[in-house]
Amino acid sequence: MGVPVNSLASPRFCGVRTFQRLPHSADCSGNDFAVLGVPFDTATSYRPGCRFGPAAIRDASSILKSYHSVLDVDIFEHCQGVDAGDVDIIPGYLDESFERIDAAVAGVLDAGAVPVIMGGDHSITLPELRALSLIHI
């Protein structure tokens, strides 16, 4: 677990859209990192739409390769991760959504994984930092 699907076994355009074709799992334990989407744009100051960011990043990441030819390193030989899906935010409700973001990030941290967070608007940094501060301060 924790490594992407082999594109020789399953074409890149097939399957559930996850970041870099990682396994999808809400259980992050036993992994080094967990990708977490935060499709939130309630606090955007001009034009909404960044809520579609996590889906667009996942879609584009399906063609990424884990091997870097210049450095001769495959990231998944050194770490493993999962795509933990998106936080179920509540459009239009800032405080309640922040509580859910905070809880989701805390859940990843409690499982011993590093959260890799894709957003959303700039405001999602606050609940993320609140969750991180509980273990790093």
Task: Indicate residue ranges for each PLM-predicted region.
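Metal-dependent catalytic neighborhoods of phosphoester/phosphodiester hydrolases
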Residues: 129-130
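Conserved small/polar residues in nucleotide/adenosyl-binding loops
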Residues: 135-137
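Glycine-rich beta-strand-to-loop/alpha-helix junction loops that act as flexible
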Residues: 118-121
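Short, well-ordered alpha-helical microsegments
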Residues: 125-126
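Helix-loop module immediately N-terminal to the HCX5R catalytic loop
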Residues: 95-106
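N-terminal glycine-rich anion-binding loop in soluble enzyme alpha/beta folds
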Residues: 2-95
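Residue-level preference for the first positions of well-ordered beta-strands
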Residues: 33, 114-115
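Glycine-rich phosphate-binding loop signature in dinucleotide/nucleotide-binding domains
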Residues: 108-113
